[in-house]
Amino acid sequence: MIHGIGIDLIEIDRIKKAFEKQKDKLVKRILTQEEEQQFHSFKSEKRKLEFLSGRFATKEAFSKALGTGLGKTVAFKDINCYNDIKGKPCIDYNGFIVHVSITHTEHYAMSQVLLEKRD
């Protein structure tokens, strides 16, 4: 049974400006330790910003699908988005099957999340 659907679109330039001011502080606020390792594995700043923007959008979309938004119930660090063996983005969250799609262009990153309740 579908619990919720969430979508988020963010300008990569918005994340870039925040990253230029906050650097690792922003990365540590948004990404889990596993995600942070992947972030630091990228060579180019462009790819790092695409990744950070995509994960930001995914976590926002997830919180919308959950119906709570980010804050008291769920925080950025509570949501770990990883890639499976084929590169598909995945989130494990207790009690739910989570479907994730992330895309980006030169200027935007977008993510859609669908939550299904486990039987």
UniProtKB/Swiss-Prot annotation:
Q: Which cofactor names does the annotation list? A: Mg(2+)
**Where is this protein localized, as stated in its record?**
Cytoplasm
Which keywords are on file for this protein? Cytoplasm, Fatty acid biosynthesis, Fatty acid metabolism, Lipid biosynthesis, Lipid metabolism, Magnesium, Metal-binding, Transferase
Q: What top-tier enzyme class does this entry carry?
A: transferase
Q: Which InterPro entries match?
A: 4-PPantetheinyl_Trfase_dom, 4-PPantetheinyl_Trfase_dom_sf, ACPS, Ppantetheine-prot_Trfase_dom
**Residues spanning the signal sequence:** none
User: Which biological process terms from the Gene Ontology are attached to this UniProt entry?
Assistant: fatty acid biosynthetic process
Primary location recorded for the protein, binned into one broad class: cytoplasm
Q: Name one GO cellular component term.
A: cytoplasm
What EC number(s) does the entry state?
A: 2.7.8.7
- What does the entry list as the binding residues for Mg(2+)? 8, 60
Q: What does this protein do?
A: Transfers the 4'-phosphopantetheine moiety from coenzyme A to a Ser of acyl-carrier-protein.
Q: What NCBIfam families has UniProt attached to this entry?
A: acpS (TIGR00516), pantethn_trn (TIGR00556)
For this entry, the protein name equals: Holo-[acyl-carrier-protein] synthase
UniProt gene name: acpS
